[in-house]
Amino acid sequence: MSKIYDWFEERLEIQSIADDISSKYVPPHVNIFYCFGGITFTCFLVQVATGFAMTFYYRPTVAEAFTSVQYLMTQVNFGWLIRSIHRWSASMMVLMMILHIFRVYLTGGFKKPRELTWVTGVLMAVCTVSFGVTGYSLPWDQIGYWAVKIVTGVPDAIPVIGQVLLELLRGGVAVGQSTLTRFYSLHTFVLPLFTAVFMLMHFLMIRKQGISGPL
């Protein structure tokens, strides 16, 4: 094992990276309320893992979506558990995100020089809400269908560009297969990609600037 470690150490300087991580200064005022961001990140990882597992069984078509979810819940070993964890972790992620935002705002963590950290956090909050909206529709049951119809119908009230936005979201005038395909793509590829990028930026800036001091 030592020879393998030495081989990697010679090329990647693993020890210096580990020393830098383990020796990072943590201010004495940091308490349990500073954990909300980390818990949100943990929930996101759970979402990725359980969501990936469900893609093996979910079929994003209006004819088979609901049936595939039923099959996952009733026939797949521990399928009900995986979907339940995904659902409850999603709720926990939203709750922890809200608490994290409140904590950062109340402790002044958005002030100079951490404005960009706040901006990336807000962008991740938008992604999180979008996850909820798009994921809610994927079972394609009555609740999901009408939720999509209402949400995608909101932009129609915008003057001039409203109809264009509506058709862009739905993939046409009416809610149908194109809408489900768009929401599935957003939920499983586009939003996770953007969220991962914003998270990386967020963490790098926190790493560079450190945790904000007390008020």
Swiss-Prot record:
Entry keyword annotation includes Transmembrane: yes
Main localisation: plastid
Membrane topology designation: Multi-pass membrane protein
Binding site for heme b 1: H100, H202
Cofactor note: Binds 2 heme b groups non-covalently with two histidine residues as axial ligands. Binds one heme group covalently by a single cysteine link with no axial amino acid ligand. This heme was named heme ci.
InterPro entries named in the record: Cyt_b/b6_N, Cyt_B6_PetB, Cytb/b6-like_sf, Cytochrome_b_N_euk/bac, Di-haem_cyt_TM
One Gene Ontology biological process: photosynthesis
Family: Belongs to the cytochrome b family. PetB subfamily.
Protein name: Cytochrome b6
Natural source organism: Auxenochlorella protothecoides (Green microalga)
